[in-house]
Amino acid sequence: MNGTLDTFFKARKDNGKTAIITGVTGQDGSYLAELLLQKGYKVVGLKRRTSLICTDRINLLFADPNFKLEYFDLNDVGCMWRLINQYKPDEIYNLAAQSHVRVSFDLSEHTADGIAMGTLRLLNAARELVPDAKFYQASSSEMFGDNPNYPFNEESTLMPASPYACAKVFAHHLVKNYRTSYGQYACSGILFNHESPRRGETFVTRKITMAAARIKLKMQQKLFLGNLDAKRDWGFAGDYVKLMWMMLQQEQPDDYVVSTGETHSVKEFLECVFDHAGLGNPDKYIEIDERLFRPQEVPYLLGDSTKAREKLGWKPEVTFKELAKMMYNEDLAFLQRNARGVAIDKMITPEIDMYGGEK
């Protein structure tokens, strides 16, 4: 960076607050960064060096003088402490993670270390260097796992069914422990599945919308999927990051479930998208590949966000059908602009699609 922090940030009138976002190049990180910049924050986005190819979601932010991007790794304690000490954030949003549930079975140690131990390292750094900073942890509905007693709220029993979910449970309990043991302002948002046009293409919703757009443009013939019967509580990521921010504006820290209160199957999402695309019954385009199933499936997730609605006044705005249509429309427009996929084999093979099971 050229010049001092003061010259870097003074170009825009701000609210005097600085926020650090880990995982800023991801879906949630990009939406959250935009929200905070709109609210006058100085935003320091942290990303892994290996995320270099994944900055498309935040490219427009580079023109904002209140946005700064730094390299970072949850496994690098020295880097973590240096950045927190340098920027002295008022708020820390920990969104970084290997977030693909199916992949966590293959990369279990990597997933667990980044999520569980990474959160521990970040909490320790915040407690020592910026004890008054507010800390947000991205917890996950996957922590509820196979628990049959849905809908799930903040008091529901956690029964994780994947390495990803187990790591999230560890981090979730750490946040509670640091809040009660040290008085640290630390809280977790238990986010149910949330999607957007910025969702990674290895996740089932985005796989479906992109495939439908390619099929519509005759760039693809088949789509390989796993369990179509899995049901999820799907919301819009842009709605969910608003609650992340709201959680850190309260006098006292607390944990909140973030959900729509509706559940839909993968098949329902598939049918909604293909109907909107004018492709008719999707069955003729779909092939089920058992390799896309998880070793342990979570069949049903449904959240109860009553606490967030009543205490914080939050509610989701984008409906399930609106979300599906939004994602398809964006993918279709992208392909039409860029002619993307022309060089791709017209039948996307199971090997290419290997990690495309539902989150």
Task: Give the location of each predicted region.
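C-terminal substrate-binding subdomain of Rossmann-fold SDR/epimerase-dehydratase oxidoreductases
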Residues: 32, 38-39, 45-46, 72, ...
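N-terminal Rossmann-like NAD(P)+-binding domain of SDR-like oxidoreductases, especially those catalyzing
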Residues: 1-194, 238, 248, 300, ...
